[in-house]
Amino acid sequence: MRILLSNDDGYFAPGLAALAEALDGLGEVVVVAPEQNRSGASNSLTLDRPLLLKKAATGFYFVNGTPTDCVHLAVTGMLDKLPDIIVSGINLGANMGDDTIYSGTVAAATEGYLLGIPSIAISMTSFEGNNFASAARVARELVERFIRNPISEPVLLNVNVPDISYSDLKGTEVTRLGRRHKAEPVVKMQSPRNETVYWVGAAGAAADAGPGTDFNAVERGFVSITPLQIDLTHSAQLSHIDQWMK
């Protein structure tokens, strides 16, 4: 069993270290992660310059690129044998609803899925990071389940774990993505050089957080597991747009 790990918070992130430690012993664990924090990088690839692959004292490999770069490089150019599963995380902060479009954590797992490898993105639903051990244990249980009962087709799972102790988790729920309200406006500030600068605003609050959503599950103390797909076709609008074009 070969397990490839990546993230978007960078190879130095405590969530990645906790994940690697938790999965140790389940197989050969290889870590390839960004050199810097690349949160919000989505599925971007670096096409305007070469990528450098280096090895840290921890044994983790790091790349001067995006999370997608890391997985793509590892799978198509670095590893002599394909990983059996890819796990991305543990992200500091939730990746629910619309977050999945922007998330580098989800993107790393998505790249694995596109390359035909079962992939999991796992995030902790706060920015405090008090309970990485809980999310790490959830990740181990999912990988153990995969080892015992492999899924016949590549799968892409988005997992969100409440930032509480493992004993306080209520269980797991398979969910759909909820929706957020539109993001908060950018924040305008003056730099020390008296330049006007802008920071991207916070994500919008939950708009669709009803039963069955990822938002609803984690709010009630459950681990949310959402199977994702790549097809962005709005099937319900096909006939409408077809008529509109005539």
Swiss-Prot record:
Binding note for cofactor: Binds 1 divalent metal cation per subunit.
GO molecular function annotations of the record: 3'-nucleotidase activity; 5'-nucleotidase activity; exopolyphosphatase activity; metal ion binding; nucleotide binding
Pfam name, any one: SurE
Keywords (A to Z) from UniProt: Cytoplasm, Hydrolase, Metal-binding, Nucleotide-binding
GO cellular component: cytoplasm
UniProt-listed Gene3D superfamilies: Survival protein SurE-like phosphatase/nucleotidase
Compartments where located: Cytoplasm
Cofactors (names): a divalent metal cation
Primary location: cytoplasm
This protein's record includes keyword S-adenosyl-L-methionine: no
Amino-acid positions noted as binding a divalent metal cation in the UniProt annotation, renumbered to this chain: D8, D9, S39, N91
EC number: 3.1.3.5
Superkingdom of source: Bacteria
SUPFAM superfamilies in alphabetical order: SurE-like
Catalytic activity: a ribonucleoside 5'-phosphate + H2O = a ribonucleoside + phosphate
InterPro entries in the cross-refs: SurE, SurE-like_Pase/nucleotidase, SurE-like_sf
Physiological role: Nucleotidase that shows phosphatase activity on nucleoside 5'-monophosphates.
UniProt record similarity statement: Belongs to the SurE nucleotidase family.
PANTHER family linked to this entry: 5'-NUCLEOTIDASE SURE (PTHR30457), 5'_3'-NUCLEOTIDASE SURE (PTHR30457:SF12)
HAMAP family with a match to the protein in the record: SurE
Name of protein: 5'-nucleotidase SurE
Organism: Dechloromonas aromatica (strain RCB)
Gene that specifies this protein: surE
